[in-house]
Amino acid sequence: MAFETTFVMLKPGVLQRRLVGEVLSRFERKGLVLTALRLLCVDTATAELHYAEHREKPFYPSLIAYITSAPVVALAFKGENAISLVRTLCGSTRVEHAQPGTIRGDFALRTTTNIVHASDSPESAARELALYFSAQDFVEWRDGNYDFF
């Protein structure tokens, strides 16, 4: 098993609907270790860098508008197979395919505003973590309860 650090963004809808604690606890209950957290307003330039691979897709303008519309919570989690685990917890990006019990299945209302972003690969995680955090933002710590998860 790979010990990884991954990036998660709780999108504006999570804050607007007062779901931050509930969504955050889903990751914590699976034993992921929170190593960085920021509440921020994403500017257009950062949003465009983050979602550059979607630039030519029809939903790109609305995605950028959504991400920059209100604050987001940027998170870094560490754990065994963290990237895969986080994506499983989040569920399908398409709301109609998101299973009940997943974050999107339980809370997302529309695909275009699917409430959470999660890195899909080690390369994406590294790029996204660097986009939202600097080295001093990370707190390395050993969770004494880690072996119980």
From Swiss-Prot:
Q: Which residues form the active site?
A: H117 (pros-phosphohistidine intermediate)
The source organism is Treponema pallidum (strain Nichols)
Top-level enzyme category: transferase
What InterPro entries does UniProt report for this protein, alphabetically? NDK-like_dom, NDK-like_dom_sf, Nucleoside_diP_kinase, Nucleoside_diP_kinase_AS
The chemistry this enzyme catalyses reads: a 2'-deoxyribonucleoside 5'-diphosphate + ATP = a 2'-deoxyribonucleoside 5'-triphosphate + ADP; a ribonucleoside 5'-diphosphate + ATP = a ribonucleoside 5'-triphosphate + ADP
Q: Keyword Cell cycle, does the record have it?
A: no
Identify the taxonomic lineage of the organism of origin.
Answer: Bacteria, Pseudomonadati, Spirochaetota, Spirochaetia, Spirochaetales
Cofactor(s) the protein requires to work? Mg(2+)
Any Pfam family hit: NDK
Q: What is this protein called?
A: Nucleoside diphosphate kinase
